[in-house]
Amino acid sequence: MRNRIMPGVYIVIIPYVIVSICYLLFRHYIPGVSFSAHRDGLGATLSSYAGTMIAILIAALTFLIGSRTRRLAKIREYGYMTSVVIVYALSFVELGALFFCGLLLLSSISGYMIPTIAIGIASASFIHICILVFQLYNLTREQE
């Protein structure tokens, strides 16, 4: 069972590694850029983005569960559907955290790295959404 769950966990972790490396490179090569000057606009944008992506994920998951292709039947038969559902579930959690980071940016809390954390989560969630769309396309198309 572990071999069937771990691919989903890896798919969730890999974008965070990519975003962390990009953050370190960004900080090294462009050290003067700061996103904390316009926290209210950033918070509103990220909260709106998170809410929209949650709606898209609900639609994608509904489409995936309702799809009746041979490829998806094999994935269910071999037990790998658990990994797919784990990726969707962790993406929902990630977008929920991003939504609340956006709300914290709208509040008067300052002194924390909330803008940096929120942009990192948003970047990783965008990569996750791209992976899920690619996965949805591959799982639901008919084989030629």
Curated annotation (Swiss-Prot):
The keyword Ribonucleoprotein does not apply. Residues 1-7, 66-85, 135-144 are cytoplasmic. Its main location: host cell. InterPro entries: RexB. It comes from Escherichia phage lambda. Keywords: Host membrane, Membrane, Transmembrane, Transmembrane helix. This is Protein rexB. The chain crosses the membrane at residues 8-26, 47-65, 86-104, 116-134. May participate in viral genome replication by preventing the degradation of lambda-O protein (protein playing a role in DNA replication). May also prevent host cell death under conditions of nutrient starvation. It holds the Pfam family RexB. It is a multi-pass membrane protein. One of its GO terms (cellular component) is host cell membrane. The lineage of its organism: Viruses, Duplodnaviria, Heunggongvirae, Uroviricota, Caudoviricetes. It is found in: Host membrane. It comes from the Viruses. Residues 27-46, 105-115 are periplasmic.
